[in-house]
Amino acid sequence: MNESSAQKRYLRKLRSRRRQTALLRISVFAGFLLLWEAAARLDWIDSFIFSSPSDLVRTFHTMLLDQSLLSHIGITLAETLLSFLLVTGISAAAAVLLWLFPRFAEVSEPYMVILNSLPKSALAPLLIVWLGANMRTIIVAGMSVALFGSIMSLYAGFRETDPDMVKLVQTLGGGKSACLLKVVLPSSVPYLLSTFKVNIGLCLVGVVIGEFIGARKGLGYLIIYGSQVFKLNMVILSIVILCAIAAALYGLLGLLEKRYLRESEG
């Protein structure tokens, strides 16, 4: 068998495996929904507390008709994306500064570890007091969950750069900025992309925490409001939508990562 036919066979096998994996995921999800619906209808579980897929569909339809749901989704999505963009820019700039000034990195590293380990849910009430109950506070809450971990992750990626490549640029007369632009940043793109995939979920978590405490709109607000007035279908529906948003945003960044890796290998 020549190399070309072996490669085609391998690619067919790879595509088949991906299809099987996707089918298995869909089957598991569909089975879970069917079991949940059956358990609610047969009174194995209390449908008032645990709801059911059919109840969630009816609640979704009702909230769509009064146009309240899309507004809440849009607010949470906008806050999450703004938090993510700010975290991306600030963490990348901070990681660059740490790489350019190693002494500063040595001094600041323990402080970043401490700040990253703080319980963010405990910070949210303070943010409300300091900044007020507004969208800015929710965005800062979203940033607080992801920022310091992102800085440390990106800086660790910069430090993994091949030292021989850095020395080569320096031997050719390049300074630190040349090493950064020509070696460190290009070689760290996989770290950047993987960090971004984590950050988008963390920002969503932080935004929801902020909405729990100081918001009048958003999916986090719907969860708190629904639990207070015992509209548990609204609570569970909001959680399901949050899961869908997280999966969609993660999937989009995953597609960007795959596209970059495919182009870099090609």
Regions of interest found by a model, annotated:
Residues 1-28, 251-266:
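Transmembrane alpha-helical segments of polytopic membrane transport and secretion proteins
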Residues 102, 159, 236-266:
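C-terminal transmembrane helix and the adjacent membrane-cytosol boundary/short C-terminal tail
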